[in-house]
Amino acid sequence: MKREELAAKLLSLVTGIAPDVDPATVIPGINFRDQFDFDSMDTLNFAIELHREFGVEVPEAEYSRLASLDKCVAYLSDKVR
């Protein structure tokens, strides 16, 4: 899967968890928490959605690798085909 495709799918998952987020305003290198108050429950829900969508299980110890769109794409690009 191309990085752009992956980023678009990730944005869709983020907006499913945080419906007030406008995908056009997400800055890829800025942490979700800083941009739109993503809290620990949002991160857990995001990890669950990643598992549902891509079959990728993210251990809790690696949740920091899901902190921003750029980090998510980097983390998942090798795991998602």
Model segments located where?
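Thiotemplate assembly-line natural product biosynthesis machinery
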Residues: 1-23, 76-80
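Phosphopantetheine carrier-protein modules
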Residues: 17-37, 54-61, 65
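Catalytic nucleophile serine of serine hydrolases
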Residues: 40
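Short active-site alpha-helical segment characteristic of glycosyltransferases
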Residues: 46
